[in-house]
Amino acid sequence: MAMPSLSACSSIEDDFNYGSSVASASVHIRMAFLRKVYGILCLQFLLTTATTAVFLYFDCMRTFIQGSPVLILASMFGSIGLIFALTLHRHKHPLNLYLLCGFTLSESLTLASVVTFYDVHVVMQAFMLTTAAFLALTTYTLQSKRDFSKLGAGLFAALWILILSGLLGIFVQNETVKLVLSAFGALVFCGFIIYDTHSLIHKLSPEEYVLASINLYLDIINLFLHLLQLLEVSNKK
């Protein structure tokens, strides 16, 4: 059996250095990275979908969670704490995977709690629209040769506008304002799906698959939530 050359071994080691991007790695490394990212993402959404379905379709769970605001806040702040921990320890294996599991569970509980306040049909519509948008945007970005890194500054500026507008929206209860903010938010996170899909190939290293999956997971969750609110407000008009 032939042994790999020293130059081949060296190039593989270089591929895994955090300073090199996935795009500069070998085809084998790139494909392995993508399998890890989207494999983790699929597992995250299986857990999230299953948790949401239990809370949505079982009246006892729906009633319990709607009467337990402390639990909703605990899962929300738990998600925030775990995402900060993941950011700090994203290179520490297997700690990053344990934190990823904890974050996904906490975020699933948070999302499941939110959807209990919406009609089942609206939730299903938002789910289907989110899935279709994610698949279309991912396919487009991975096949495109355009440089989407230029979107970054504009998207982060739009995100801050969205956050500040959302805070103002708490005090201004207007259906038209909610509709506009929901549509704007959905567009912003469609942009983030394109940006983060491009970034996972051109900015992240082959060992940062946990960070890549978290970025995409959060993009999809936020897109879903904005579409959910958009559909809810639209149905009231």
Swiss-Prot record:
The chain crosses the membrane at residues 38-58, 68-88, 95-115, 117-137, 152-172, 175-195. Its main location: host cell. Belongs to the BI1 family. LFG subfamily. The keyword Membrane applies. InterPro entries: Bax_inhibitor_1-related. May affect virulence through inhibition of apoptosis. One of its GO terms (cellular component) is membrane. The keyword Transmembrane applies. It is a multi-pass membrane protein. The lineage of its organism: Viruses, Varidnaviria, Bamfordvirae, Nucleocytoviricota, Pokkesviricetes. This is Golgi anti-apoptotic protein. It comes from the Viruses. Keywords: Apoptosis, Host Golgi apparatus, Host membrane, Membrane, Transmembrane, Transmembrane helix. It is found in: Host Golgi apparatus membrane. Residues 210-230 dip into the membrane without crossing it. Residues 1-37, 89-94, 138-151, 196-209, 231-237 are cytoplasmic. Disulfide bonds: none annotated. Residues 59-67, 116, 173-174 are lumenal. PANTHER family: BAX INHIBITOR-RELATED (PTHR23291), PROTEIN LIFEGUARD 4 (PTHR23291:SF50). GO terms for biological process: negative regulation of apoptotic process.
